[in-house]
């Protein structure tokens, strides 16, 4: 089944709930970057959170949301992009990180990411300069960190759940997440009731493994609160890189540097950090780029 994000609005329009099955998306990221278990879990959670934030906070097809996470853990930096049309991409600085399981027998994402560092979210909506909100990491588990970001940077009371189940061979069994947001008009009693539902909710990975859909996960979170489901949004890993794009960047290099690539290397090759695609430039390609300086 293809990945998608389900969304719903409470009947009184006091809450929004989003839930995603991102299994295929995270599998594609793992395949492209050859990530090991701890790196897979961290990158997968970041991708799911980015998809949920983009679905809730972007309005136009050209809008872009970028998440940067830099903790003091061994996976290093995490960088992810999301769009309003359900595409995400991203990479982890150190893809080959395995760690012992934590005290509850799960992948130790908090140790992998680190508990000291920053989480930054940049929104580019095509009007004025992009806006960046930044908060310190509070746990490194990422779900709590994104919850804190929404509360402190966007002033939105929220609850976020993120989960990636990695098999022993480093493949991804399931991945997904949810995001509950309070809207203007919500009162503390309503929020407490839904937060209680969230606290008793099993891990999203367990719900997905048991066969629940994103819509059913939303219903579990809503409990007795009636909700109106909105249009579902397909979700996939996709990158907008191209040989032409990287060529445009290379064309800005000094003439002498391009000539050195021709004389010493007989061409050039570049790799996209976000997706791992490689692009080769022949001598003829480089000579064509050099003509842009003339």
From Swiss-Prot:
Disulfide bonds join 239-241, 272-275. The keyword Glycosyltransferase does not apply. Keywords: Chaperone, Cytoplasm, Disulfide bond, Redox-active center, Zinc. It holds the Pfam family HSP33. Gene3D superfamilies: Hsp33 domain, HSP33 redox switch-like. One of its GO terms (biological process) is protein refolding. InterPro entries: Heat_shock_Hsp33, Heat_shock_Hsp33_C, Heat_shock_Hsp33_N. GO terms for cellular component: cytoplasm. GO terms for molecular function: protein folding chaperone; unfolded protein binding. Under oxidizing conditions two disulfide bonds are formed involving the reactive cysteines. Under reducing conditions zinc is bound to the reactive cysteines and the protein is inactive. The keyword Disulfide bond applies. Redox regulated molecular chaperone. Protects both thermally unfolding and oxidatively damaged proteins from irreversible aggregation. Plays an important role in the bacterial defense system toward oxidative stress. Belongs to the HSP33 family. This is 33 kDa chaperonin. It comes from Lacticaseibacillus paracasei (strain ATCC 334 / BCRC 17002 / CCUG 31169 / CIP 107868 / KCTC 3260 / NRRL B-441). The gene is hslO.
């Amino acid at each position: 089944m293809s990945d998608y994000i389900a969304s719903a609005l409470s009947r009184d329009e006091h809450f929004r709930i989003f839930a995603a099955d991102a299994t295929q998306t995270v599998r594609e990221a793992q395949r492209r970057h050859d990530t090991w278990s701890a790196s897979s879990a961290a990158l997968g959670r970041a991708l799911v959170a980015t998809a949920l934030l983009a679905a809730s906070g972007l309005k136009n097809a050209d809008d872009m949301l970028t998440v940067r996470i830099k903790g003091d853990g061994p996976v290093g930096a995490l960088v992810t992009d999301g769009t309003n049309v359900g595409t995400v991409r991203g990479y982890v600085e150190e893809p080959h990180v395995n760690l012992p399981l934590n005290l509850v027998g799960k992948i130790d994402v908090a140790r992998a990411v680190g508990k000291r560092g920053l989480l930054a979210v940049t929104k580019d909506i095509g009007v004025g300069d992009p806006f960046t909100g930044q908060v310190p990491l509070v746990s490194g588990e990422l779900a709590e960190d994104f919850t804190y970001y929404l509360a402190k940077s966007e002033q939105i009371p929220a609850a976020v759940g993120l989960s990636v189940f990695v098999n022993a061979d480093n493949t991804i069994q399931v991945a997904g997440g949810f995001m509950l947001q309070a809207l203007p008009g919500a009162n503390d009693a309503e929020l407490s009731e839904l937060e209680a539902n969230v606290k008793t909710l099993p891990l999203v990975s367990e719900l997905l493994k048991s066969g629940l859909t994103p819509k059913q996960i939303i219903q579990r979170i809503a409990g007795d609160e009636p909700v109106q489901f909105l249009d579902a949004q397909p979700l996939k890993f996709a990158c907008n890189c191209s040989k032409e794009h990287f060529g445009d960047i290379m064309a800005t290099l000094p003439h002498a540097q391009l000539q050195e690539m021709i004389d010493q290397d007989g061409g050039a090759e570049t790799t996209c950090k976000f997706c791992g695609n490689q692009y080769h430039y022949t001598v003829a390609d480089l000579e064509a780029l050099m003509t842009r300086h003339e």
